[in-house]
């Protein structure tokens, strides 16, 4: 094996040869053999091999393999030097291979190495985006689990940093095509990341692009299958997919398939849903999603049937007034509970779909049923007025910091809920019922949000290797507003301020897209 002096001497031969470098194959071979030497020889080889690589195409495989040996050296400084120089090997047909190698090197736990690998990948991305994507997706589809995970996170965090001249329409089409292959077998967490990747592509910002994404989500949600409320994996899949679909819906991209599925398959099973996440009010979560989607529902095939299912579910949460004894006191032991959070969602959804069949209450219900509904509305409205007054009194004069306490935050949300229900009930009391009022759902921001705007999410953009996510999503403690006890004592329900989109579990541990474990070793 060559000494340091021999390496320098052969480096000099190549450096002085200028245009005739390719004639000194023996000198380059000496430098390649430097990877078999000691620490000093390896450091020199890591720098010299890439410098003259392009002049010796017949030694390309040997040169790349020599550099890879250095990328796996026990000495961290040698590894870092070798990784830093890898982009110089990314020429012509070698680029996809280098991209594949760099993708595998993402599995390092050394933060400096991880940074170098990221930078090297970005560097070759700018040389040839398609070739780089070939290497990345090759590992996502066939590589080890840790490599797959980090390659997906690389795409989800780094693609958006690349300029338009790199992410051309053709490149984005390749990303979509390859992503569809991956989506045939993914976990929930991976699915969320891919939706983040795809929804950020410029070519998918159009109406037709958004429609493509909705179809991808619908396919992932298995909307053709019968819903199994007792299977937490089935429930989790539907929730995750619907959360990804909601920001995509607009007046031009309809939610009809999802709303139909919720009305036909989920609402009838609402009380038997198995929660996939401990501490989550699964029924309220489902009703919130339905309410958000109902605004963008198009023409529905079985509108009357589904509206009736929604109406029947609403009645379950709109109690009749308690019977009074002869002395005027409540004959029962307990007042009915008024579940305002649930009613806001159901009433809003009914109000939205009712616009499409405005004579439902007057022509489709018999007189007795309509009378019963109005009694329930009236009773609920009376209880509502009591709480609205109590909430306004509790918040009166409070501004700034005073409104930021947890207790007052909950009361502010409670006031939004009760005000929303009040507006919707007034509409339905009209003769004939009206569907003209507009309200903003209590958990939605008041300011206008652009159609298709993505929800904020945490990025892995630091220079350190991503840490493994915890098994369960981080959620704020449930916040329940308990109004003062009295004639209309009730719970307003749970107010979850957490951002949606977290997924419980990882590949190999859950049924949704669980992938077989593979041990593949070095694939360079």
Curated annotation (Swiss-Prot):
It is found in: Nucleus; Cytoplasm. The modification N6-acetyllysine is found at residue 251. Keywords: Acetylation, Apoptosis, Cytoplasm, Methylation, Nucleus, Phosphoprotein, Repeat. Residues 370-391 are annotated as: Leucine-zipper. The modification Omega-N-methylarginine is found at residue 500. Residues 487-497 have a biased composition (Polar residues). Acetylation at Lys-251 impairs antiapoptotic function. InterPro entries: API5 (IPR008383), ARM-like (IPR011989), ARM-type_fold (IPR016024). A motif (Nuclear localization signal) lies at residues 454-475. Expressed in all tissues tested, including heart, brain, placenta, lung, liver, skeletal muscle, kidney and pancreas. Highest levels in heart, pancreas and placenta. Highly expressed in several cancers. Preferentially expressed in squamous cell carcinoma versus adenocarcinoma in non-small cell lung cancer. The modification Phosphoserine is found at residues 462, 464, 469. Residues 462-472 have a biased composition (Low complexity). One of its GO terms (cellular component) is nucleus. Residues 452-524 are annotated as: Disordered. Residues 2-360 are annotated as: ARM-like and Heat-like helical repeats. GO terms for molecular function: fibroblast growth factor binding; RNA binding. The modification Phosphothreonine is found at residue 399. The keyword Acetylation applies. The keyword Cytoplasm applies. Belongs to the API5 family. Antiapoptotic factor that may have a role in protein assembly. Negatively regulates ACIN1. By binding to ACIN1, it suppresses ACIN1 cleavage from CASP3 and ACIN1-mediated DNA fragmentation. Also known to efficiently suppress E2F1-induced apoptosis. Its depletion enhances the cytotoxic action of the chemotherapeutic drugs. Monomer. Interacts with FGF2 and ACIN1. Two regions, an N-terminal (aa 96-107) and a C-terminal (aa 274-311) are required for binding FGF2. This is Apoptosis inhibitor 5.
């Amino acid at each position: 094996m060559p000494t340091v002096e021999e390496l320098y001497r052969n480096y000099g031969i190549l450096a002085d040869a200028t245009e005739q470098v390719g004639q000194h194959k023996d000198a380059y071979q000496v430098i390649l053999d430097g990877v078999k030497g000691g620490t000093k020889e390896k450091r020199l080889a890591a720098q010299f091999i890439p410098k003259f690589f392009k002049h010796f195409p017949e030694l390309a495989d040997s040169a790349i393999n020599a550099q890879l040996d250095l990328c796996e050296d026990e000495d961290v400084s040698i590894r870092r030097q070798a990784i830093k120089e890898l982009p110089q090997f990314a020429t012509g047909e070698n680029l996809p291979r280098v991209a594949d190698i760099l993708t595998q090197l993402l599995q390092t736990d050394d933060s400096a190495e991880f940074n170098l690998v990221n930078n090297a990948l970005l560097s070759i991305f700018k040389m040839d985006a398609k070739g780089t994507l070939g290497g990345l997706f090759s590992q996502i589809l066939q590589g080890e689990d840790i490599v797959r995970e980090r390659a997906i996170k690389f795409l989800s965090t780094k693609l958006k940093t690349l300029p338009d001249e790199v992410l051309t329409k053709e490149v984005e089409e390749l990303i979509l095509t390859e992503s569809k292959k991956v989506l045939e077998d993914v976990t929930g967490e991976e699915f969320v990341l891919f939706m983040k990747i795809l929804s950020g592509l410029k070519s998918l910002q159009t109406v037709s692009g958004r429609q493509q994404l909705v179809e991808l989500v619908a396919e992932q949600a298995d909307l053709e299958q019968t819903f199994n409320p007792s299977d937490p994996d089935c429930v989790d899949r539907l929730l995750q997919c619907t959360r990804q679909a909601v920001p995509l819906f607009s007046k031009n991209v309809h939610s009809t398939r999802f709303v139909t599925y919720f009305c036909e398959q989920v609402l009838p099973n609402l009380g038997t849903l198995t929660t996939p996440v401990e501490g989550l009010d699964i029924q309220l979560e489902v009703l919130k999603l339905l309410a958000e989607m109902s605004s963008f529902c198009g023409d529905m095939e079985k509108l009357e049937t589904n509206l009736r299912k929604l109406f029947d579910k609403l009645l379950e949460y709109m109690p009749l007034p308690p019977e009074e004894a002869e002395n005027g006191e409540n004959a029962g032991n307990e007042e009915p509970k008024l579940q305002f959070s649930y009613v806001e969602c159901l009433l809003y959804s009914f109000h939205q779909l009712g616009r499409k069949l405005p004579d439902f209450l007057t022509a489709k219900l018999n007189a007795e049923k309509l009378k019963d509904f109005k009694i329930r509305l009236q009773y609920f409205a009376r209880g509502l007025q009591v709480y609205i007054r109590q909430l306004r009194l509790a918040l009166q004069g409070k501004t700034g910091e005073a409104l930021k306490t947890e207790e007052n935050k909950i009361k502010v949300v409670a006031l939004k809920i009760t005000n929303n229900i009040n507006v919707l009930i007034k509409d339905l009391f009209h003769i004939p019922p009206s569907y003209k009022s507009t309200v903003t759902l209590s958990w939605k921001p008041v300011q206008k949000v652009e159609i298709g705007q993505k929800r904020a999410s945490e990025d892995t953009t630091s220079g350190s290797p991503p840490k493994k996510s915890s098994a369960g999503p981080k959620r704020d403690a449930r916040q329940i507003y308990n109004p003062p006890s009295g004639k209309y004592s009730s719970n307003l329900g749970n107010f979850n301020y957490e951002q949606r989109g977290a997924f419980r579990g990882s590949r190999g541990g859950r049924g949704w897209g669980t992938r077989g474990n593979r041990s593949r070793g070095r694939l360079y």
